Design a protein with these regions (language model features):
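Terminal low-complexity tails and localization/encapsulation signals of metabolic enzymes
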Residues: 1-33, 66, 70, 102, ...
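N-terminal alpha-helical segment of soluble enzymes
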Residues: 25-94, 296, 306-312
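Residue-level signal for inorganic ion chemistry
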Residues: 28, 64, 86, 108, ...
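N-terminal Rossmann NAD(P)-binding subdomain characteristic of aldehyde/semialdehyde dehydrogenases
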Residues: 57, 68-161, 199, 204
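Rossmann-like NAD(P) dinucleotide-binding subdomain of oxidoreductase/dehydrogenase enzymes
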Residues: 120-268, 380
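ALDH superfamily catalytic-core signature
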Residues: 226, 234-361, 379-392
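Conserved glycine-rich beta-strand-loop-beta hairpin in the small C-terminal domain of fold type I
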Residues: 347-351, 368-374, 393-397
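Single conserved hydrophobic/aromatic residue that forms the stacking wall/gate
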Residues: 398-406
Length: 406
């Protein structure tokens, strides 16, 4: 299936018919093409959203809620087709793909349900110590911002776009979605459900294309009132620099740590860490990316990690370059003295899990977000040392966990 741009509810090819072929990370099979939008088309999408906002912001909230419900119903009817597209395009197994579609639909429903109770607020003077009720009255109303620019990543093109878009729509904002190039086929199919549901012209627009062509054009457009982005820290910092003070919602990369203490249940710990590190080949911003373990239990935990990881086989990374990066990090760590306790195998862009012990701060793997199936283990001598190492790392911290029975 070929994707199209969605601008003012029209399904369009890119200017000059510029396209990019899409191949599955599973076996390299051809899936279709995506249009590579021009800068003029990116601006046209924002223009459509800006024009549509003038009427959409005046639409009753019940109308918006009902349109979201209708979109959710259409998504439910197309669940298998949407899940299969996601599976083939970004390399998730079919169970993970179905889960993403289901979660997205449930999020739409939850957003619509929650919006029913979102109204203005009335406060009287007696909420403050110095005033009586009749002396002051405060009326607070909710007002939509305008055009929202949503930018989604390849690994959760549906979940991590709908969490930006559904709340924006129900509160009377209009949206331009810039999807990652990988994931655009699935995103296009998903968001045509909103057009089918009857969302008015220009309320939701879909753009895909090279960031060099359309990225800064959209980021610096003064009609954009908020930018919501999920992706790498590098790109997030660029957005912060060029966005001219526009409100930002940024979810960036993370080197997510687990701190394992000597009284932890190691069977439970190993199972949780391995699942967190290697599901979807570690291609998640919240994947477990480094383990700090007290020295007295290091050997036992590592063996349990190795045993648990043996249940994972070759799985695709999004492309060969991603697999190359994992191999580079592994070789750098081994060169600097790390010990390979679980060796990975590779076939093209597919990798099986690798676990490295004796990882230290001199190694790139200690600092860099690997976004793949390789897990570094660092030895510590106390909880305070572990906490300080987690806090002091140069890399970003999106989340952390600790395991202890005390």
């Amino acid at each position: 299936m070929d994707a199209k741009l969605i601008i003012d509810n029209k399904l369009l090819d890119a200017d000059n018919n510029a396209t990019k072929d899409v191949f599955s990370p599973w076996e390299g099979q051809y899936l279709g093409t995506i249009p590579m939008a021009s800068s003029q088309q990116a601006k046209a999408a924002i223009s459509a959203a800006d024009k549509a906002w003038q009427d959409w912001k005046l639409t009753t909230i019940n109308t918006r809620i009902n349109l979201l419900y209708k979109a959710a119903d259409i998504i439910k009817s197309k669940r298998e087709d949407l899940a299969l597209s996601l599976c083939l395009e970004i390399g998730k197994n079919i169970s993970e793909a179905r889960s993403e579609i289901d979660r997205a639909r449930e999020y739409i429903m939850m957003t619509a349900d929650s919006a029913k109770s979102l109204r203005g607020s009335l406060y009287y003077g007696d909420v403050f110590d110095k005033y009586q009720k009749h002396q002051k009255t405060g009326l607070y109303s909710r007002y939509p911002l305008g055009v929202i620019l949503a930018i989604s990543p390849f690994n959760y093109p549906i979940n991590l776009s709908i969490t930006k878009i559904a709340p924006a729509l129900v509160m009377g904002n209009t949206v331009v979605l810039k999807s990652a190039t990988i994931g655009s086929l699935s995103s296009f199919q998903f968001y045509t459900c909103f057009i089918e549901a009857g969302f008015p012209l220009g309320v939701i627009n879909f753009i895909c294309g090279n960031a060099s062509e359309v990225g800064d054009i959209m980021l610096t457009d003064k009609r954009v009132q908020l930018i919501a982005f999920t992706g790498s820290t590098e790109v997030g910092n660029h957005i912060r620099e060029v966005s001219l003070g526009v409100p930002l919602l940024l979810e960036l990369g993370g080197k997510d740590a687990a701190l394992v203490l000597k009284d932890a249940d190691l069977d439970y710990t190993a199972a949780q860490i391995v699942s967190g590190a290697f599901s979807y080949s570690g291609q998640r911003c919240t994947a477990q990316k480094i383990v700090f373990v007290e020295s007295s239990i290091k050997g036992e935990l590592i063996q349990k990690l190795v045993d648990s990881a043996a249940n994972y086989s070759l799985s695709p990374l999004i492309n060969a370059a991603a697999a190359d990066y994992i191999e580079i990090l592994k070789e750098d760590a081994l060169t600097h003295g790390a010990k390979l306790v679980l060796a990975s195998s590779r076939s093209g862009n597919k990798l099986s899990p690798a676990i490295l012990a004796e990882v230290t701060e001199e190694m790139r793997l200690y600092h860099e977000e690997q976004f793949g199936p390789i897990l570094p283990v660092v030895t510590i001598n106390s909880i305070s040392e572990g906490v300080n190492k987690i806090k002091d790392r140069k890399s970003t911290r999106l989340n952390s966990s600790h395991v202890s029975e005390s």
